[in-house]
């Protein structure tokens, strides 16, 4: 039988997995999606898995056959609207985001969720950048490091990884937070705005592995949107 969290506020809680939604945004991830979902189900058997999908391959079909809740993405398309839809589709207390390319450690899902449920954090950010991950190209590492440094100066807060795809959000934080879902680099705003507004944010270090499949990221577009979201989160 899966461990119970114990007590929180004097009340016995459900098994931790029943309080977690794992949210992923997918685009042509048929090579990885089966492995990632299987790994999640073994790590947190009772977790809900929600996928917002804009694929032209068999990603959605494979995910549904394995028990994931799949939401097909229609206009407005793009990473921001997909992430917003995935976060808001959860009916559970904690939403853990994950990229569906096998780069992130599913064994951290439960510990990160516990840091929200037990320790009172509103957001737990999994930073890949304690050092340069072997799986991350140098240009990506330097860009991420530079943007994190800029955000740290702007917010007077030690930011490590603006673009991490693995975070645990308290669902009530998502419900209260005001942000612009449109455009790229939404994770930047979803980290910086809670910091600015005084929510309890915890940053931990996680490992990062080589991805399965091809990346769909556009570096120049991502850089522009990162700068735009740093500015928006600080001043708007």
Predicted features and spans:
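The conserved acidic donor/metal-binding loop of glycosyltransferases
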Residues: 99-104
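Short aromatic/hydrophobic "clamp" motif used to bind/position activated sugar donors
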Residues: 95
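A conserved acidic beta->alpha catalytic loop
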Residues: 53-60
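Hydrophobic/aromatic residues located in beta-strands of well-ordered beta-sheets
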Residues: 22, 48-49, 123, 201
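Active-site beta-to-alpha loop of glycosyltransferases that engages the nucleotide-sugar donor
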Residues: 24-35, 58
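Hydrophobic helical membrane-anchoring modules
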Residues: 1-20, 31, 154-157, 179-236
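Short, acidic, metal-binding catalytic loop of nucleotide-sugar glycosyltransferases
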Residues: 38-47
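Acceptor/aglycone-binding surface of glycosyltransferases and processive sugar-polymer synthases
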Residues: 71-89, 106-184, 210-231, 235
